UniProtKB/Swiss-Prot annotation:
HAMAP family hit by this protein: IGPS_A
Composition bias, Polar residues: 1-12
Top-level taxon of origin: Archaea
GO function terms (MF aspect): indole-3-glycerol-phosphate synthase activity; phosphoribosylanthranilate isomerase activity
Protein name: Indole-3-glycerol phosphate synthase
Pathway(s) this gene product operates in, as recorded in its UniProt entry: Amino-acid biosynthesis; L-tryptophan biosynthesis; L-tryptophan from chorismate: step 4/5
UniProt keyword annotations, A-Z: Amino-acid biosynthesis, Aromatic amino acid biosynthesis, Decarboxylase, Lyase, Tryptophan biosynthesis
Length: 251
């Protein structure tokens, strides 16, 4: 299924924990708010289309963030975020499905569930407007997972890091693709990754730049390289949430 042999140790630990999670017993169905439409609307209004992420902590940082998740999300939207991403991975990111439920009730923008989903039943843990599917982890199962997500009403943001993974995502009929600037082998970030991968995507695919976007200059660089949306977590969580979101939105 997944290609994990060369992944960084923290990533291997995340995947091992994901495999051990008990699957939900009830199927989830969703009437989703459109993520591509929200990104397009933000751009049409002259805003940089930001997907702001509620991320309590991460294996790549020593920082921990407290605070009510729903209030954080409201602050992000007040700062102009087009959508909100929510970590639901409990063991390494301190995320929860309860936080996502509260956030989706609190805001009227699309909410992305960011987690490490390896099997179809894991899709059923919580209703969200979109789910993250990581091409490298799913391997040959990507197409089946994408179809299963859509069958439940989810949109899927398919994450890639290389032209090869992009080709697999396109072959699986992904229509929202995120290019992760973070190399999951070394956990290093290179903002040039997006510019190297994105030009190979079909014109009708919604492209999202992920990881390492910290400043208005970074945001402008990603937009100039073709990003339809920018997923930003740590840079927003590490500062005054509303003000930091607004600085990126107005880049």
């Amino acid at each position: 299924m997944d290609d994990s042999s060369s992944l960084a140790s923290p990533v291997q630990s995340i995947l091992a924990a994901a495999r051990r999670r008990d699957p939900p017993t009830r199927r989830c169905t969703v009437s989703a708010r459109s993520l591509p439409a929200a990104l397009h609307s933000a751009a049409a209004d002259g805003r940089t289309p930001i997907i702001a992420e509620v991320k309590p902590t991460s294996p790549t940082t020593d920082t921990e963030h407290s605070g009510d998740p729903a209030e954080l999300a409201r602050e992000m939207v007040a700062g102009g975020a087009a959508a909100v991403s929510v970590l639901t991975e409990p063991h390494h990111f301190d995320g929860s499905t309860d936080a996502l439920r509260a956030i989706r009730d609190a805001v009227d923008v699309p909410v992305l569930r960011k987690d490490f989903l390896l099997t179809e039943p894991q899709l059923d843990a919580v209703a969200a407007d979109a789910v993250l599917l990581i091409a490298r982890f799913l391997g040959d199962d990507l197409g089946d997972m994408l179809a299963a997500a859509r069958d439940r009403g989810f949109q899927a943001l398919v994450e890639v890091h290389s032209p090869r993974e992009l080709a697999r995502a396109v072959d699986a009929d992904a229509d929202i693709i995120g290019v992760n600037n973070r190399d999951l082998t070394a956990l290093t970030v290179d903002l040039d990754t997006f510019g190297a991968v994105a030009p190979e995507a079909p014109a009708d695919v919604t492209l999202v730049a992920e990881s390492g976007i910290a400043t208005p200059t970074d945001a402008r660089t990603m937009r100039a390289a073709g990003a339809d949306g920018l997923l930003v977590g740590s840079a927003i969580m590490d500062g005054p949430v509303r003000d930091t979101t607004r600085r990126l939105v107005t880049a």
